[in-house]
Amino acid sequence: MKLVIVSGRSGSGKSVALRVLEDLGYYCVDNLPLPLIGSLLEQLKGSNDLVAISVDVRNLPEQDKVLVKQLASLPEGTELTSFFLNSSDKVLLKRYSETRRLHPLSKSRVSLQEAIKLEGKLLEPLSQQMDHYIDTSNLNIYELSDQVRQILLGSVDKELVINFESFGFKHGMPTEADFMFDVRFLPNPHWEPELRPLTGLDEPVAEFLNRQPLVNKFIWQIENLLETWLPHLERNNRSYLTIAIGCTGGQHRSVYVAEQLAKRFSNGKHKVNARHRELNHAKA
């Protein structure tokens, strides 16, 4: 089992680091009480081999000793990596002023500036126990994400999952699509009596559509568009990209086009999924 502990001052980027870990498949728990680390790992044993927890000032004071004790008693075979994120007082003050969020220690009559300084003092012992110290003062969220991935994977490369989804316009448009293409102008197998009961997954329908120059040209143009912009989308720190293909009923044309695109992109470095909304609904 791999355990990652993320700690640091409020506003330094712990939530960004946790999102990166979540994208990498980690089961993430924010601000877990330190005495519960052992029981959490025990519960997840066998079902989740990647676990990440965040530890912040709300777990303190004096629980740094508890953390040492908990880490010393981790289950055998647990691979531990820990991060401490920090920023200068000036940067933290600016971030809190911009977001207008309440600092965890901004209670009673303690000013924001005093709360930031107090938190730094309280977390100092904990920061010295962490494996990796990252100063995020001059980092944006993408640069911080890259640093976390670099430490964990030895590379900043991020696997982008591409989902091709077919649907029927008469059943409503999908809300989660990043790109949407309307293929209702393509030749329709529905008007061929022998093809009407079939779907775009069936060979006779695939052969019919493959004979249509317009279909092949449109697929090629979508493929070319996506290949042109995928590198830029990846640099934008995306985890998923959903391309929706719609025809009238979501049975023939959209299914075929989505399948063809999925096959073409499966030959590359990305993880690719093809799903067919209306066909899945028909099975349910």
Swiss-Prot record:
Matching InterPro entries: P-loop_NTPase, RapZ-like, RapZ-like_N, RapZ_C
Annotated ATP binding sites: 8-15
Superkingdom: Bacteria
Pfam families: PapZ_C, RapZ-like_N
Keywords: ATP-binding, GTP-binding, Nucleotide-binding
Keyword GTP-binding: yes
Binding sites annotated in the UniProt record for GTP: 56-59
GO terms for MF: ATP binding; GTP binding
Protein task: Displays ATPase and GTPase activities.
PANTHER family in the cross-refs: RNASE ADAPTER PROTEIN RAPZ
Family: Belongs to the RapZ-like family.
Name of this protein: Nucleotide-binding protein Shewmr7_3352
UniProt organism field: Shewanella sp. (strain MR-7)
Lineage, uppermost ranks: Bacteria, Pseudomonadati, Pseudomonadota, Gammaproteobacteria, Alteromonadales
